[in-house]
Amino acid sequence: SSLVPESNRELPQSITTIFPGNCDGELYMTKGHQHPDPQGEIYYGLEGQGGIILFDGKKTSWLDITPGKIGYIPPGWAHRSINTGQTPYKFLAVYPGCAGHDYQWVLDNGMGLRAFKSNNNFELIEF
């Protein structure tokens, strides 16, 4: 977690690790959140294989993230990270400090997609 304050004009950052595995077939993931002050966010893949489910309340999108790849999350889109590989998935996130984090939005609205183990790969299923 960043020592940079989550305030206007600052750029906090964090490194997240998601271990491989699943619960009843659904791949391990973060809780997901939306930013109350809609701001863009950058994810940079460090290790492993994973991706980001994006949801704006109507449309869904998927971004593959691998080492060295940058993923952009547009303002107003909720996002959740998922480990789609067999090794730990690690990424760096950088976001404006004024953005905030609203986890309740995801509990109330879902994410539009879920990721499930499928043989040696994964499958995205709408819900």
Regions found by a protein language model. Give the residues of each.
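Active-site region of the double-stranded beta-helix
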Residues: 1-65, 84-89, 94-127
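Histidine-centered metal-chelating micro-motifs
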Residues: 51, 70-71, 75-80, 100
